[in-house]
Amino acid sequence: MNPNQKIITIGSICMAIGTISLILQIGNIISIWVSHSIQTGSQNHTGICNQRIITYENNTWVNQTYVNISNTNVVAGKDTTSMILAGNSSLCPIRGWAIYSKDNSIRIGSKGDVFVIREPFISCSHLECRTFFLTQGALLNDKHSNGTVKDRSPYRALMSCPIGEAPSPYNSRFESVAWSASACHDGMGWLTIGISGPDDGAVAVLKYNGIITEIIKSWRKQILRTQESECVCVNGSCFTIMTDGPSDGPASYRIFKIEKGKITKSIELDAPNSHYEECSCYPDTGKVMCVCRDNWHGSNRPWVSFNQNLDYQIGYICSGVFGDNPRPKDGKGSCDPVNVDGADGVKGFSYRYGNGVWIGRTKSNSSRKGFEMIWDPNGWTDTDGNFLVKQDVVAMTDWSGYSGSFVQHPELTGLDCMRPCFWVELIRGRPREKTTIWTSGSSISFCGVNSDTVNWSWPDGAELPFTIDK
């Protein structure tokens, strides 16, 4: 083959390759156009149905590698219209308690990014229930978890996440800088109360829908503190209780009425022989009932009930089935403070039904272990130690902690009554488990049902120590 023939042959091959490449490019353009037309047609069809599509992305990090677990398209059909929560309904009749949520946050936190927390609580709007919690500005199994047994620090913050989920940086919403807190929804927006600052000058910051609306300064300069559970909203007004003063003697207790984040009224309780801390409150037929912790001298729980004008009544649960911890053995109760083992205490709750009362308490008399619900049909007014129903939810051998009430309004459930619910904190780590450098907790929750339920144990279940502890 002479040089001219070689040139012609090479040129022909190049032209053939170029032609094939051009055909492939044209085919690619046609394919993209067809695909786009199909997608556009699908979107137009969705628009005709007048539905909104929300894409939920579930992502995580595994050993520093980003993994997209799932992308799920969900048709959002729930009405998000705002409405004022009336709070006028009575509590639903119940026979027991059904498990509602369990977040397993300590177990998950041994390998995943989960916040170190304490004082979790639950509050519901007319659309959803959320878990609120006080972080320590640290993650489990990380060096900054060291020393998180401390209650009050500038690193603590109130955050929230969907109920039943382990609180992590990826699903949690910042609410307020706080080492003591409360939150509730009036049907129009979230009210959050976050207390932070020095012991002798703490400040409560009130926010409504995330905007600062009011400030409350410590009036006794002795650790201003609030409920560590949900506040209560009735007919557009929200109510909360704060304490300022000694934890082992008479202190100052104030009820605040708040509308859209602004304080409209407040009163101080005249209760020189009572002690109110960490109150668990709920609405009942337009009034507010709070069952609290007496850290001074009562092993039975104090209560305060008030209407929307803040006219109030006070007392102690009379039952000989004692609700605090530490406490004596059940026996003879009193409608005044029961002084036996009355010092110290733990946050708790009860639900009043006429003269009867559902009492939530640790199973242990002396340590924060186990949890049970007891129905005393005459316990609000009578002092005997008899009861009719006991339901176990955490075994005596497993750690518990704080507990508190929350309700689900008829606007959420569709019922014609207020559904009573409660949560239990499952504390792990220090000071009891000294193999760890940290203190944190997970949570479980239950709601009242008018049907048979079951005795069982839903413990935290994490195996300690973690890698950071070794």
Curated annotation (Swiss-Prot):
In its UniProt record, which GO terms are filed under biological process? carbohydrate metabolic process; viral budding from plasma membrane
The activity regulation comment is: Inhibited by the neuraminidase inhibitors zanamivir (Relenza) and oseltamivir (Tamiflu). These drugs interfere with the release of progeny virus from infected cells and are effective against all influenza strains. Resistance to neuraminidase inhibitors is quite rare.
Q: Which Pfam families match?
A: Neur
* Gene3D superfamilies attached to this UniProt entry: 2.120.10.10
Membrane-crossing residue ranges in chain numbering: 7-27
- Residues the record lists as binding substrate: R118, R152, E277, E278, R293, R368
Query: Which terms are listed as keywords in the entry?
Result: Calcium, Disulfide bond, Glycoprotein, Glycosidase, Host cell membrane, Host membrane, Hydrolase, Membrane, Metal-binding, Signal-anchor, Transmembrane, Transmembrane helix, Virion
Q: Which reaction does it catalyse?
A: Hydrolysis of alpha-(2->3)-, alpha-(2->6)-, alpha-(2->8)- glycosidic linkages of terminal sialic acid residues in oligosaccharides, glycoproteins, glycolipids, colominic acid and synthetic substrates
Annotated positions binding Ca(2+)? D294, G298, D324
State the disulfide connectivity: C92-C417, C124-C129, C184-C231, C233-C238, C279-C292, C281-C290, C318-C335, C421-C447
Q: What is this protein called?
A: Neuraminidase
